[in-house]
Amino acid sequence: MTDSAAPRLHVQALSAGCAEAARRWAERLGLPLAADDEAEFAVQVGEQGLQVLQLGADSPGPVRVDFVEGASAHRRKFGGGSGQMIAKAVGVQPGIRPRVLDATAGLGRDGFVLASLGCEVTLVERQPLIAALLEDGLERARRDPDVAPIAARMRLLGGNSADLMRAWDGEAPQVVYLDPMFPHRDKSALVKKEMRLFRPLVGDDLDAPALLQAALALASHRVVVKRPRKAPIIEGPKPGYSLEGKSSRYDIYPKKALGKG
């Protein structure tokens, strides 16, 4: 991750009824609760949960994690099921739902897709604020009767993915999934909006080769790396094969075949 000056943030309650929750989030994230005229982002706590808003006249609007409605709900209902490229990349097949470690969870979109297909997914996110958004989204998902069974298959860990993988305790994931932060060519409004949040807070994953090395050491069956379609492979071993879509590519590093069980 790049080492740039950290942006200024403050926590804001959107209503009087959310003041106590805002205080708890401010304490937990180590952020000021009072208004800051020089803040670049506001962490807002409202009736609909946690969201982050880039401040200023050209703000793209708030970013939050919502697995119940919006894009995640649409993809869950109409996204193509096990025929999706991500499903093929991680090895979803009839009778096979691999255990997946999503080591670059972000806002959890890919992890949710895999969990909706029946995979047990452990998500790791190292940026505390992004992890907080994801935690909040998962908590709300667990209260929805339609989405709760999917959210129950998702476990969130905070921390540095490479360190967690090197010190992994217990049964290894069958698949480690990586989607390192690189300059994205996707021009959709949603991606551009999220990138404006992620870039200042997270930066690019310049340690991607170390992540790949740790993933290859941990995964029992395969490592999958999501990349922009025309981007070079991550420095290190070459993938066994790739699956290519319109804007993205999945580089697959197989170790052994996934079996039913």
UniProtKB/Swiss-Prot annotation:
Transmembrane segments: none annotated. The keyword S-adenosyl-L-methionine applies. InterPro entries: 16SrRNA_methylTrfase_J, SAM-dependent_MTases_sf. It catalyses: guanosine(1516) in 16S rRNA + S-adenosyl-L-methionine = N(2)-methylguanosine(1516) in 16S rRNA + S-adenosyl-L-homocysteine + H(+). It is found in: Cytoplasm. Its EC number is 2.1.1.242. Keywords: Cytoplasm, Methyltransferase, rRNA processing, S-adenosyl-L-methionine, Transferase. Gene3D superfamilies: Vaccinia Virus protein VP39 (3.40.50.150). GO terms for molecular function: rRNA (guanine-N2-)-methyltransferase activity. The keyword Endoplasmic reticulum does not apply. It is an enzyme of class 2 (transferase). One of its GO terms (cellular component) is cytoplasm. S-adenosyl-L-methionine binds at residues 109-110, 125-126, 179. Belongs to the methyltransferase superfamily. RsmJ family. Specifically methylates the guanosine in position 1516 of 16S rRNA. This is Ribosomal RNA small subunit methyltransferase J. It comes from Pseudomonas aeruginosa (strain LESB58).
